[in-house]
């Protein structure tokens, strides 16, 4: 936990990540902390991973998942299915469609899209280059030519995506990740992203957005096959929540045991298995071990996640470690598959939603089994995946959804707005702290209801009212936190609140939603 203290340590891109900059440049994953484009892109892209954005992505996720499941159904139970191959196709197609409106159509061709081939070769070579002496890399002319050719192809594909999107008329432009990168302005600086950085972000999202999630789904499949009792519980939950109908966005939050399975899978097999940090100044680790500024510390997640002082029987697959009544007992920094602090994975919600949908959909439609015995072999590049894992899948014969789980018919509402009330004019100030936009949207929704009930409402960021909270009327604060830190538009407010004498706030009527 000590090296995860962001007041003392920060992410470093020295070593392997420095070589990965050949592919991703100053994209979110490989950007250095002092590069302006990191903060700008992070602030600008946070709303693209908000709860409202996740709802918008859901139908496209279903589209791609259905392509995979339809192919399995048509191939039939006599055909062995390569799990990692199928999940790689699925996650690549999903991030491309949800994020950029592009279809790789991986399930309509036998070979992987050339983008995947180039990406895999480039990632493999980047890892090797980080372990070689510089002179070795310079002497390997043929290997270097292939490496540079693969990177050029990755960049050309993403540059073409940008070019095509810029040609679309405004009414034809989808609301997705790419459109946000092209059009949105950084709320702090007012600047937009340049095309080179957008290209780097596209490469980053296409690589990181599908590699890690495909590994998660592949390992989860393996662990379910090894633990049939867990698979039976998961299938029972899916039958109760989904029945034999199509998955809906609202189902995701109800698939609690599926979520536990995914989190326990990430404990045992974190698909991004390490991250590196460096001390900001010379320091002592654990009060004993001297570290100099610039030294590299590697946090190995498979070891961290198997600490016997935290996890009983750490090698055992037990999703109940993450049950609702147990998850709060897990010590901070004991489970970190998405990294640490402000440099943690921005796409965490996207990955978990996609994985929950896909795993539930597989269990809803199929009985799966292994055609032969399998000894786990892990393939490592930038991420971890099980190598050579195959399954067979037979369409299930469904039973009707239990009566208690059937949706209850409700009267049709002609309007979602409250009944108008006479205007009494009491001031209602809605203050929000929000990077992703979710808290701001909730504040504006409350304001709309307040107007209908006769209040005089105003909505503003928390920072606008640092030092001047009104004592007239009511103040409602709607805010989130990010890795223990205030949102960008609430920093000044938090600093003021920590220093202000308590007596000066007497008379302020307030409530906090957080």
Region locations from a protein language model:
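Cytochrome P450 catalytic-core helices
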Residues: 212-230, 235-237, 348-364
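Cytochrome P450 proximal C-terminal region
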Residues: 65, 69, 117-121, 239-247, ...
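Cytochrome P450 heme-thiolate "Cys pocket" and heme-binding signature region
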Residues: 24-30, 203, 208, 246-250, ...
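Cytochrome P450 substrate-recognition site 1
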Residues: 1-57, 64, 82-83, 87-94, ...
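Cytochrome P450
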Residues: 52-63, 73-97, 105-114, 136-157, ...
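Conserved cytochrome P450 catalytic core segment spanning the I/J/K helices
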Residues: 50-52, 146-216, 250, 255, ...
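Conserved cytochrome P450 K-helix E-x-x-R motif and the immediately C-terminal K′/meander segment
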Residues: 156, 160, 245-286, 308
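Conserved cytochrome P450 K-helix/beta-meander segment immediately N-terminal to the heme-binding cysteine loop
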Residues: 6-8, 299-327
